[in-house]
């Protein structure tokens, strides 16, 4: 056992003994007396039983990794539900007992440790089905099991294992096997047959970050948890055993969770995503587009992905979090306790991380987000606005080429000239088109091809099947948002005598194009016309002449549950955001700064947030994910080493490495302590050169300090900061107004930090107003401009008041329905839903197996509300 693992074990032991005593030993995870059954006359013993693999009340699958710390532990008698299980526990070097206990019954179980003096220590464990739910409440139905080995309707099956390896030269192998008739990029791994293994000289050798050198052979475990697939990969030595008490030496105790992109729903099983930008870029492109997953494996990480945490397969953040909780428990029970966990993912993979980290803190210790958004439901407001403006302007491209003439005619007939459209959208017109084609259809409850349904139910049709299954994004959030109230029921809801899932979107009072009017880009008549005729969306996500009105309960619950990510619970996690320009592919660059603004609003700072910007579209640079993994690993290792009682948010800032700094360009990549990296080369040269004849020794190592200087210098390209240049005030002060204008121009030209219809309407970059508070129309908002038809502010304001009789958005006020985001909410059991969720009971235990003690992981609801 290497030094770091010994130190971790000692730190855990100290944490456990510090929580000993009769009080903690007789309390269950839910805070109730842990005695199961009639009152006992037992004498409470000294010591503690600790569940390492999860909170004791969240255990699933019938097993749990536990640790017993009592005096004279080797002579104690251990029972599970009255049956001796002492032979399943192993005495560790420090005298503690540790082991994987199995055979837990569904519901409450009791572990009891009897000492020789007749005293007893007890712990209640609440076990949930491996197929779920644990805390998400009633599961989506119907559900289609697509695995042939399923043994029940929860799709459960035994885990399956296969071995793969990385060839010594992937590039040479690719060149030798390239088929012009079927071109493609090589995958990261090749099949490994233990009965007929490849020659050892054909297998790459890797040295982990702890100095262990092994062949680059990977074991891939696949199985089913929570009715859907998971995948675990680990660097593996086929001839050796691996147990949670004795992991193979190449594991460094760290976990990397990777996620998939897009957004959607499904009524059947999916596939765990692979690749940093899975779902956003083609599979197999890792060698060119970057692959931090294979780099992590080579460094000794275990990697995890689940289909349920793939946003393109499952928009519901609660079941996504639940799948990670259950799967991370499985990792600990089969592989061993974890030091810390890093997330990575692009687009929907970034949303999933930031959603989950804010609503269920403790699952991750660090986030690497790429081509990111903050969440689904404020982004949905942007995309809904796009859809309405597209309808109004005629900016809609049919998939049928025959309709091209119709599109051209709509352009010519548009009430606003095409050159004026960006002033309304806040972005190039291509962005709304991509949004409408790629994402908006997922919101429609009557999707023609409802994903995964497989004819198990008929899909909703407002005319012919009002009782059909509604297949939209909102409908997948029923437990979180709740049903609509009877007073707003549509005819179909009245027919069914039940409300559909409420919509947390609203455009009441939104003045579309306000900034465009103020800047003189559109005329007063155009401004009045778009706001008079823009309309809204009904419950079926169809256009209606009236503005969209949010359902109050859904709106409040969207904040409460974390569906709207206010970023108020992210201070415990470092975040590295990787960003490139977006000319109109609906992955707006401004989202990185949107998250930063939310952090600044809730935390008072954004010191735990780093933005790396590069020229590669959306992603910034193809080497960013690998670089970010190395920097995040360094950041978390620093936090892990801090055993002080300092709050974790303070540790996050205190141990921020110098390499965790904002970047405008990726030119500093060659100046790296981990070895030089060439921008835009993916994994061609790092960690091992894949070009024939090139070795690491031939690539010169450059001073890392030069990288810091280069980042400061190139940072001026993106956001001229005179303070960074160290100029005296007498020079800097007169230049500052000019610099401010330059900065604003560079945000647009260099970083494509465009806006949205709501920022054009006056909302701040945080864009947290899914529904705004209203104020009376103010003539001051409409400066006189004879050229665009605003002759008097008062007269124009009167016309605006006729369109907005109840007032217009007041973005100086908090959003309507905004409440604090509660963490670790539960939504009932398989039969009964708790709409909007209720916080889990507070646990008295740290979940010691989830992360090193310095991270203080307890999986508890927020205690400061």
Residue positions per predicted region:
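C-terminal His-loop and adjacent cap/lid subdomain of alpha/beta-hydrolase
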Residues: 33-346, 350-865
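Bacterial signal peptide processing site
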Residues: 20-23
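C-terminal motif of bacterial Sec signal peptides marking the signal peptidase cleavage site
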Residues: 16-18
């Amino acid at each position: 056992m290497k030094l770091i693992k010994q130190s971790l074990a000692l730190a855990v032991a100290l944490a456990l003994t510090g929580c000993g005593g009769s009080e903690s030993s007789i309390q269950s995870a839910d805070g109730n007396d842990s005695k199961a059954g009639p009152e006992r006359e037992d004498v409470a013993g000294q010591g503690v039983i600790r569940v390492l693999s999860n909170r004791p009340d969240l255990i699933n699958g019938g097993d749990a990794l536990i640790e017993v710390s009592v005096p004279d532990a080797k002579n104690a008698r251990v029972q599970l539900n009255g049956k001796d299980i002492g032979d399943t526990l192993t005495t560790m070097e420090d005298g503690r007992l540790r082991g994987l206990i199995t055979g837990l019954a569904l519901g409450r179980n009791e572990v009891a440790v009897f000492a020789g003096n007749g005293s007893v220590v007890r712990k209640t464990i609440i076990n949930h089905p491996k197929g779920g739910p644990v805390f998400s409440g009633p599961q989506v139905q119907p559900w289609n099991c697509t695995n042939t080995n399923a043994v029940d309707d929860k799709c459960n099956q035994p885990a399956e294992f296969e071995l793969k390896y990385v060839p010594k030269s992937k590039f040479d192998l690719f060149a030798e096997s390239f088929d012009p008739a079927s071109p493609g990029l090589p995958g990261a791994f090749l099949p490994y047959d233990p009965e007929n293994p490849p020659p050892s000289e054909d297998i790459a050798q890797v040295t982990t970050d702890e100095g262990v050198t092994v062949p680059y052979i990977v074991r891939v475990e696949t199985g089913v948890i929570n009715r859907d697939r998971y995948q675990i990969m680990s660097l593996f030595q086929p001839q050796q055993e691996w147990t949670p008490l004795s992991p193979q030496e190449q594991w460094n105790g760290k976990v990397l969770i990777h996620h998939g992109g897009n957004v959607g729903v499904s009524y059947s099983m999916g596939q765990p995503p692979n690749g940093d930008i899975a779902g956003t870029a083609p599979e197999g492109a890792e060698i060119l587009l970057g692959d931090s997953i294979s780099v992590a494996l080579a460094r000794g990480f275990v990697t995890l992905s689940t289909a349920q945490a793939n946003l393109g397969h499952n928009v519901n953040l609660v079941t996504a979090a639940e799948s990670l909780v259950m799967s991370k428990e499985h990792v600990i029970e089969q592989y061993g306790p974890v030091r810390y966990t890093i997330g990575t993912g692009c687009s929907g993979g970034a949303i999933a991380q930031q959603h989950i980290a804010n609503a269920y803190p403790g699952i991750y210790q660090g986030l690497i987000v790429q081509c990111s958004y903050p969440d689904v439901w404020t982004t949905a407001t942007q995309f809904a606005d796009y859809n309405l403006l597209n309808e109004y302007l005629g900016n809609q491209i049919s998939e049928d080429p025959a309709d091209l003439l119709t599109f051209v005619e709509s352009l010519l007939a548009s009430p606003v000239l095409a050159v004026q459209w960006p002033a309304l959208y806040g972005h190039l017109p291509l962005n709304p088109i991509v949004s409408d084609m790629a994402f908006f259809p997922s919101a429609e409850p009557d999707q023609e091809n409802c994903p995964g349904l497989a004819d198990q139910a008929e899909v909703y049709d407002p005319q012919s099947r009002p009782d059909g299954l509604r297949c939209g994004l909102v409908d997948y959030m029923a437990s979180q948002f709740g049903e609509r109230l009877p007073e707003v029921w549509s005819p179909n809801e009245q027919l069914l005598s039940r409300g559909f899932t409420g919509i947390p979107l609203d455009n009441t009072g939104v003045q579309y194009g306000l900034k465009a009017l103020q800047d003189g880009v559109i005329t007063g008549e155009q401004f009045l016309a778009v706001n008079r005729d823009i309309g809204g969306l009904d419950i079926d996500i169809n256009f209606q002449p009236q503005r969209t009105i949010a359902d109050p309960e859904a709106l409040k619950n969207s904040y409460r549950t974390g569906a709207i990510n206010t970023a108020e619970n992210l201070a415990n996690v470092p975040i590295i955001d990787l960003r490139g320009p977006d000319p109109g592919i609906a992955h707006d660059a401004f989202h990185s700064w949107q998250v930063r603004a939310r952090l600044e609003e809730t935390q008072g700072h954004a010191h735990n947030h780093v933005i790396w910007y590069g020229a590669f579209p959306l992603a910034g640079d193809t080497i960013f994910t690998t670089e970010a993994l190395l920097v995040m690993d360094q950041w978390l290792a620093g936090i892990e080493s801090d055993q002080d009682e300092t709050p974790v948010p303070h540790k996050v800032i205190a141990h921020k490495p110098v390499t965790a700094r904002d970047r405008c360009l990726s030119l500093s990549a060659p100046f790296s302590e981990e070895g030089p990296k060439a921008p835009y080369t993916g994994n061609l040269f790092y960690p091992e050169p894949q070009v024939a004849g090139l070795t690491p020794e031939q690539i010169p190592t450059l001073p890392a300090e030069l990288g810091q200087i280069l980042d400061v210098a190139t940072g001026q390209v993106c956001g001229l900061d005179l303070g960074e240049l160290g100029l005296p005030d007498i020079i800097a002060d007169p230049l500052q107004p000019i610099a401010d204008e330059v900065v604003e121009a560079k945000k647009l030209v260099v970083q494509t930090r465009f806006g949205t219809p709501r920022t054009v309407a006056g909302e701040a970059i945080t864009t947290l107003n899914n529904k705004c508070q209203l104020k009376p129309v103010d003539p001051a908002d409409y400066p006189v401009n004879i050229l665009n038809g605003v002759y008097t502010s008062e007269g124009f304001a009167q016309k605006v008041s006729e369109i907005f009789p109840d007032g217009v958005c007041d973005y100086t006020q908090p959003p309507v329905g905004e409440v604090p985001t509660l963490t670790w909410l539960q939504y009932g059991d398989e039969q009964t839903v708790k709409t909007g969720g209720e916080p889990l009971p507070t646990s008295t235990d740290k979940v010691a197996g989830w992360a090193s003690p310095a991270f203080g992981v307890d999986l508890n609801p927020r205690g400061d509300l």
